[in-house]
């Protein structure tokens, strides 16, 4: 999310806590020095499945045949991507303007998987 204006006239970043939480989880993978040059970033977001994707009764642990693989609801891909790019800025690369190629996928988790995010960054 973008910065918001409060009733008292100041601005705040509603996603600041999310960015900090993400950075804390991935900091151990950060390079010793931020990457330089043109970069490619691939992001894969595994989203939780709603109960409506599952069968009922004794087969409630199985997915319906009609269950989609791709997540087409909010949050939007561009907002998720911006959150990750902003969170990793200055630690993984000098500036997110270095990201020349960006691929974002939003998929539903498979049975037994937890929601997660994969981040791949490489030089191009």
PLM region descriptions:
Residues 1-124:
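Acidic, proline/glycine-enriched N-terminal capping motif
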């Amino acid at each position: 999310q973008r910065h918001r204006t409060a009733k008292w006239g100041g601005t705040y970043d509603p996603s600041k806590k999310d960015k900090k939480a993400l950075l804390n989880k991935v900091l151990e993978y950060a390079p010793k020095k931020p990457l330089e040059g043109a970069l490619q970033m691939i992001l894969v977001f595994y989203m939780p499945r709603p109960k409506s994707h599952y069968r009922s009764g004794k087969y409630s642990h199985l997915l319906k045949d009609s269950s989609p693989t791709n997540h087409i609801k909010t949050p939007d891909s561009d907002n998720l991507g911006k959150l990750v790019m902003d969170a990793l800025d200055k630690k993984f690369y000098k500036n997110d303007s270095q990201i020349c190629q960006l691929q974002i996928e939003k998929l539903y988790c498979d049975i037994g998987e937890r929601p997660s995010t994969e981040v791949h960054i490489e030089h191009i």
